[in-house]
């Protein structure tokens, strides 16, 4: 984390003195940084812990969130992004103000802040902190009660995450997201390989055979009405939820508004959709 912070600082030094430099990375982000930042913004504790937990407890039907996300990123690249960049908007509320009026802009800001403050950020910090407590046994390490360790971990994670954005602006966030994303991608590939090897007593093939022939109902990706993600919801509520998330969610699309041009922005969005 220290190395990522240092590289991010070097990349953004002297570039956060203006509004566009701070909030839009000088409108100079390339496709690689846009894709990396979008993926890391999306891939937080609720995905790593929530979706894995859902697959373990039920089946693979929760992958529907990722399947419909790919469609949403295509819509973002070819329908929404050209309009955002054509108007040189800095935020989605600014776009809504131009499209409708100031009342709609203010209402959207209030709704976004309530959603981030009461739903998104608390769930991410809470789930991430529980994972850290389990991995490093923080209560025993610091000799403090579990509740205190949880609160301390939440504060530390929140402060570490805020440092990038507050002092480095959007470009620092994009750079750090991309660098962390490389490590996460490597680890994400290594974990199932190592897990299958351990399950197969050193053989990935044997491990894969065991998975394919044990509790096979968990490999079902077509969710029933009793699963967390019923199949029918892919064509009703879920597709609209993903269209909101990938096309109009401020903290996701902010990276695309900072693209150096439309082509780079579209490539970045489509690249993130490919990995989804």
Regions found by a protein language model. Name each.
Residues 153-157, 175-179, 268-271:
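Hydrophobic core positions of alpha-helical segments in small-molecule transporters
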Residues 6-29, 83-90, 94, 104, ...:
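Membrane-helix boundary/linker segments in multi-pass transporters
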Residues 1-48, 165-168, 181, 187, ...:
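Membrane-interface "cap" regions at the ends of multi-pass membrane proteins
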Residues 36, 111-115, 176, 271-272:
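Hydrophobic alpha-helical segments of secondary membrane carriers
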Residues 12, 56, 80-86, 130, ...:
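Membrane-water interface regions at transmembrane-helix termini and the short interhelical loops
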Residues 5, 39, 61-165, 237-245:
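Helix-loop-helix module between adjacent transmembrane segments
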